[in-house]
Each structure stands twice: as C-alpha cells, then as structure tokens.
From Swiss-Prot:
Belongs to the UPF0473 family. Disulfide bonds: none annotated. This is UPF0473 protein SAK_2028. Pfam families: DUF1292.
Amino acid sequence: MAHNHNHDHNHEHQHEVITLVDENGNETLFEILLTIDGREEFGKNYVLLIPAGAEEDEQGEIEIQAYSFTENADGTEGDLQPIPEDSDAEWDMIEEVFNSFLDEE
C-alpha cells in the first residue's frame, strides 16, 4: 500500500516507533502511522507502519505496511501478522479508515 502524501510537511509528526525483526534477524525501525480497532468486525486490531525516516518517492508516495494483531490475555499487544491478500473485507475496511485518516490530516 502506498499513499500520496499531499499535506504540509512543516509540522512535526509524533509517531510511536517499533522495531520489526525479519526471518534473518535483521531489525528495521518503523513509525506507527495509525492503529485500527477491528475487533468487533474481524476479532483483531490493525496497525499501519512506515519505515522510520522514510522519504517520499518521485510520485510523492511512501510505502506503508499493514499488519493485524490480537491482544494477549494480559492486555499487551500480540505479535504482528501479515494480512492475507485475499481478505478483501479486511483490506476494504483498512482502506476506508486510512482514507478518513488522510482527510483529517
């Protein structure tokens, strides 16, 4: 998912930062762009991430990664899971919330 970032960049964004570790043990820092509560509809939550310090490409877009997660019994956030590409209902909901988020920016 890429998004066209057409708003003023002279203001500061204060995003939480997390580190993701890939299957090879490589760590990558990401900023949390948005979290979505999808528990009522899908039984899980979602998070949209951008690489920390990411710059827009020539088209003014930044690559966004989306994951789902469920809360652990103790209330902490569980492991991030990729969202299945064929889960149209989930992707439609994420896109709708994300577009609303962009409209508010």
